[in-house]
Amino acid sequence: MKPITILSLGVTLVLSMTSCNKFLDENPYSSLVDPDNASKIEKLLGSAYSTSSIAYLTELSSDNIQDDGVNNPYTNQFCEKAAYWETIVNSDGLYDAPYLIWQNTYNSIAHANEALEDIEALGGDKEELQGIKGEALLARAYGHFCLANLFCLPYDPSSSSTDPGIPYIKKRVVNLQPNYPRGTMAETYEQIAADQI
């Protein structure tokens, strides 16, 4: 090979191995919505509602269900799979599972928290932001309420200070696998009530 070709390959190789440390040290978290006005925060808040069908599990424990026995084509799904917390596939081929309810509800809570932080960054006391802030707080409280009802013991005032609750997330999630402490049922319901005021 010609010396110029070898030299240019060597220079290219050396330059390609250098990098900018500042770029690599930054957290890769980014928001899909640039929240610079109330309208964009409202659009973000549309993601603060869970896409999982909590009804698969909650209706079985209510009095809103009628037993049609073997004549019901969904008896197998609702009675057997939901009772054992297995994946349920509906008639459209879509599926839902308890772990997806947990994951999707916390994802919705993360969107509500992101909206709340963006509202504060814009000056949360503005009149146009108050309704959006109230909706975000209510969405966060509702998500935690659903999770507490599905994944915790029933609320009992006599043991709520010792019964384990759920992690109550109040900040934007920036870590890939965050580890949040699990409070008691009393703490969980106090925070749910505080978000509704």
Protein language model annotation of sequence segments:
Residues 1-29:
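Bacterial Sec-dependent N-terminal signal peptides
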Residues 20-65:
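Membrane-proximal, proline-rich intrinsically disordered regions
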Residues 31-35, 62-72, 153-162:
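Short, surface-exposed recognition loops and adjoining beta-strand edges that mediate ligand/DNA contacts
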Residues 53-58, 143-155:
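Secretory-pathway/luminal and periplasmic proteins that interact with or process carbohydrate-rich
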Residues 55-82:
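N-terminal capping/interface segment
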Residues 80-151, 179, 183-186, 197:
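Conserved, well-structured interaction surfaces
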Residues 150-190:
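Short coil/linker segments at helix-helix boundaries
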